[in-house]
Amino acid sequence: MWKQDETLEQIVLECKKYTEEGTVASYIPALAKADVSTLGIAIYRGGDEQVIAGDADEKFTLQSISKVIALALALLDVGEEAVFSKVGMEPTGDPFNSISKLETSVPSKPLNPMINAGALAVTNMIIGETTEQSLGRLLSFIHELTKNPTITYNLEVAQSEFDTAFLNRSLSYFLKQHGVIQADVEQLLDLYTKQCAIEMCCSDLARIGYVFANEGRDPDTGQRIVPLHVARIIKTFMVTCGMYNASGEFAIRVGIPAKSGVSGAILALVPNKYGIAVYSPALDEKGNSLAGIKLLETLSCREEWSIF
């Protein structure tokens, strides 16, 4: 794709000015410490073919990007029918933490797995008798996807999110009242906040993107580690719901499957080609990485990545 890393480095430098226009997620105290000037990217093509630029070695927590991985694991654990009996498939124009549609929809279930209510319901379906067992299975799945067995969660971020998870608590109790979840709410929130606090760098995340981009195949062996139908479900939700209530605009301007998190990370993929990870913690008003989106838009236009 690029003959030299310097080409990608130059594009990153051109987009770095946009970091000044965003703000970090201050409502989660541990995330408020992030350096707003950070911008890094990794593009993984399989095997040893990887290009990185900028601050690609900086670690970040997955936050809402973890919803993609948890959904894949839940689909493997309980199957498509069970998952979508509790969670819908439709996009929403509401913010990711909104409760309004839950109150008016019949039956009262979350519209999709990418909003917080839907993600809580999905995490509830990951098999495990305890939080530790479910989290261990999720981490093992991530280790298989990344080939990095050292990945774990950031305890400080997890505790910070657990202590301030007032809205997610209310969402969870609402879901429990309507039979969408069965778990103890505090145990579910413990699992969910640790899931969101799983920490890695751009290279790890880009490798995960490669697996989903290439129909669930391991980049080293070519063996399918995620079933084809699961990889397709994941890619579809990334297109329709992956960028919160800016998913439509992102589809038009960038045109590739992507999932963002309030840490400032974005997982993106070019189907049948690349896995891409971008990190820049300065967010726009909808909770997406401002410079990260600008970087992906620039690259997509330059390389004609759009699937539309």
UniProtKB/Swiss-Prot annotation:
Q: Where does substrate bind?
A: 64, 116, 161, 168, 192, 244, 262
Could you tell me one molecular function GO term of this UniProt entry? glutaminase activity
Which EC class does it fall in?
A: hydrolase
| Keyword Hydrolase on entry | yes
Q: What is its EC number?
A: 3.5.1.2
Single biological process term from Gene Ontology:
glutamine catabolic process
Under catalytic activity, the entry for this protein gives:
L-glutamine + H2O = L-glutamate + NH4(+)
Lineage, top-rank taxon, reads: Bacteria
Q: Does the keyword Hydrolase apply?
A: yes
Q: How does it associate, per the subunit comment?
A: Homotetramer.
The name of this protein is Glutaminase 1
